[in-house]
A protein has these predicted regions:
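Vicinal oxygen chelate
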Residues: 15-20, 74-118
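Core segments of cupin and vicinal oxygen chelate
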Residues: 12-53
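Conserved catalytic-core motifs of GNAT/GCN5-like acyltransferases
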Residues: 12, 35-38, 101-103, 127-132
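Short beta->alpha transition motifs characteristic of CBS
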Residues: 107-108, 114, 125-132
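Long, continuous compositionally biased terminal/linker segments
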Residues: 2, 47-88
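Short beta-strand micro-motifs in enzyme catalytic cores
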Residues: 42-44, 70, 109-113
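N-terminal beta-strand motif that seeds the catalytic metal site of vicinal oxygen chelate
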Residues: 1-22, 129-133
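Glycine-rich acetyl-CoA-binding "A-motif" of GNAT/NAT acetyltransferases
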Residues: 122
Length: 133
């Protein structure tokens, strides 16, 4: 996937236990070769060159909650990186929500996995094998 192929600038998730969430995402983002890009009081971002993914305390002071039917997928560079994401997420406390593997209902090129982060947000790592598309 080309670096400029995304239509998304960035995504933010709310966290009820900010420091725990930052520790979780430090491990998960490292598995995808992403690093911390920016930090502000109550907010941290990760990416591969610009702040693509943020975790923050909700600005309105209310509790963070999950969106029913919503999830975020991170681009993996290989099937092995999908597995690394899975392993890192589970080791950091995520709940499994779909083991790594192909899902032909999403297309022959799809390979990915799903987990629930510490606040219950559904996150995914996806590898798109162009040779199978």
């Amino acid at each position: 996937m080309a670096e400029d192929s995304s239509i998304i600038s960035h995504v933010s998730l709310g966290a009820n236990h900010f420091e725990r969430a930052v520790g979780f995402y430090d491990a998960v983002m490292a598995s995808l070769a992403c690093s911390r890009i920016m930090e502000h009081p109550g907010a941290v971002s990760w990416g591969r060159g610009f702040p693509e993914f943020w975790v923050q305390t909700p600005i309105n002071g209310a509790a963070a909650s999950q969106g029913n039917g919503s999830h975020i997928s991170f681009v993996a560079a290989s099937k092995a990186q999908v597995q690394q994401f899975w392993d890192a997420a589970l080791a950091a406390g995520a709940q499994p929500d779909g083991e790594p593997g192909p899902r032909e209902e999403y297309g022959k090129a799809y390979y990915g996995c799903f987990v629930r982060d510490l606040d219950g947000h559904k996150i995914e790592a996806t590898y798109w094998d162009q040779s199978l598309a």
